[in-house]
């Protein structure tokens, strides 16, 4: 039997989403020992992380994209607000990168569904 990543993601989207939420939370709230080498490079990390977060849920439930944006945007906002309490700093640009990542993940999932013909 051939392995199809899209089918795997669709089947295990909840577990994948929970693991991504845990990973994002750990990386976002771990205290920094030093600033990133390239200023602003963390925006790419935010974009990719939140695109990855939105993709599985959007692939499984493409009509629920509005709920996905609201839920994960609230999560991202709470993470940014919590960062000053763990020797980090929250930024509006990080939150904007999170939102762009969510949109990217949703668009990629919708494109995947359309290409697959589902």
What annotation goes with each model-predicted range?
Residues 1-55, 72:
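"…centered on the first transmembrane helix and the immediately adjacent amphipathic helix/loop
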Residues 11-15, 61-68, 91-92:
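Membrane-helix interface segments
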Residues 17-28, 67-84, 99:
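Small-polar-interrupted transmembrane alpha-helices in polytopic inner-membrane proteins
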Residues 30-31, 62, 87, 113:
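Short helix-capping/hinge motifs at transmembrane helix termini and TM-loop junctions
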Residues 37-43, 79-100:
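Interfacial helix-loop-helix junctions of multi-pass membrane proteins
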Residues 49-53, 90-109:
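Alpha-helical transmembrane segments that form the membrane-embedded catalytic/substrate-binding core
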Residues 57-62, 107-113:
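Structural signal for the C-terminal ends of transmembrane alpha-helices
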Residues 114-118:
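Short, charged juxtamembrane terminal tails flanking transmembrane helices
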């Amino acid at each position: 039997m051939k392995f199809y990543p899209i089918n795997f993601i669709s089947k295990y989207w909840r577990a994948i989403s929970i693991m991504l939420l845990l990973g994002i939370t750990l990386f976002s709230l771990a205290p920094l020992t030093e600033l990133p080498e390239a200023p602003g490079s963390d925006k790419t990390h935010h974009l990719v992380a939140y695109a990855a977060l939105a993709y599985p849920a959007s692939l499984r439930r493409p009509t629920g994209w509005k709920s996905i944006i609201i839920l994960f945007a609230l999560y991202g906002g709470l993470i940014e607000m919590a960062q000053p309490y763990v020797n980090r700093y929250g930024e509006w640009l990080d939150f904007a990168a999170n939102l762009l990542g969510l949109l990217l993940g949703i668009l990629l999932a919708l494109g995947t569904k359309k290409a697959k013909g589902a």
